[in-house]
Amino acid sequence: MNKNKLNRLDEMMQSQVDSGMIPGGHLRIIKDGERVYDKCFGMADVARNLKVSDNTIYRLYSMTKPVTAVATMILYDRGLIDLSDNVSWFLEGFKDQKVETKDGIVPANREVKIIDLLTMTAGLMYPDRNVNPSGDKMADLFDKFYERAFSGNGTYSTVEMCNEMGKIPLFAQPGTCWNYSVCADVLGAIVEVVSKKRLGDFLKDEIFTPLGMNDTDFYVPAEKRDRFAEIYIRGEDGKLTPCDWQHLGLVYKYTKRPEFEIGGAGLVSTVNDYEKFAQMLLNGGKYGDTRILSRKAVDLISHNIITAEQAKTFNWDSCIGYGYGGLMRTLINPEITTVGSAGEYGWDGWTGNYFCNDPENNLTFMYFIQVCGGNGIRPLRTLKQVMYSALDD
């Protein structure tokens, strides 16, 4: 790649810091297995005067989802599950599923299946109030969860929480439309039931330890907290201040292992660790001499597997031109999105972290920050535009 063109990224990243868009961040680009751009900018924690570094620990939030997808496909590779399996076979809370409709609550047309969870087409909701009755009831469940957590009496376990989720009527019939929701959390519970291990233990045994992802977990041990980045939120005045609240079932501020290990949002990691995970996917399930997934399993989750009808609601600005695979977007119409190559896949997180793999060009792009809600799609798109301009003919 043209290193002179890549150097343009220095100015762009520093501008994000200087303008107050982010307190700090890390941008890494890997081409053909080599780090062709790898620089840190600004502060991981302003109050502690902690600079962003290679070993800064970040909250992944929804970049946890691809990890849970891989865990699910490990079970698939071993013949322990089939993607057409009913979720109720593993989680009894999903038996006799009901659906909220304009005419009231009715029985589901069919059972929720594992493939519905992988593709976010199960009809589930996140805890969103004033959207629909299902979202309100999911929010009630999470409120109850927080009450238990903050009372000091412990919370629901992963399996217990997901069984409670299954008792809430769906907002739509299973398999009919895409909707971002707790699907990955439920997959995490299925991993626990099938493997007979806690989700964190399964991930450590089957993914993190084999890949050498030693700083990835559902909490940050005391001896590593001096590397843990602060999380910031933008106020009405546009300025960033530390954020002291948590959502999506995250509690304890990562100081101890949670009872509910959240497959959709709970992990922390470093750029170094997540690079190994991303490269494993890009290499068809293998990193170095270590195989985590079959190439077939990687192909399945990294390609579009939702129908045109389901995709009508997959309409976020950041997903224009993309289809959806196993808890990841996948680029199917690059002429619409204007940046990227057909077959690119990846995902992002609530605090602005983002990764994508481009198999056509053997590229991995990683952008890590800690700002609630991220900083929009334009900064990411312009960074990627410069990356692609640096590709040699």
Predicted segment positions?
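Short, conserved catalytic-motif segment at the N-terminal edge
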Residues: N2-L60, L80, D96-G104, I377, ...
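A generic structural motif
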Residues: G42-A44, H247, V371
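Short, surface-exposed loop or secondary-structure junction motifs
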Residues: K98-V339
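Short glycine-rich, acidic/polar surface loops and turns
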Residues: L327, A342, W347-N357
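Active-site SXXK
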Residues: N7-M13, G33, R59-V87, A184-E192, ...
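Acidic helix-start/capping segments at beta-turn-to-alpha-helix junctions
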Residues: S88-K95
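Short, well-ordered beta-strand elements
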Residues: V36, F355-C356, N362-V371
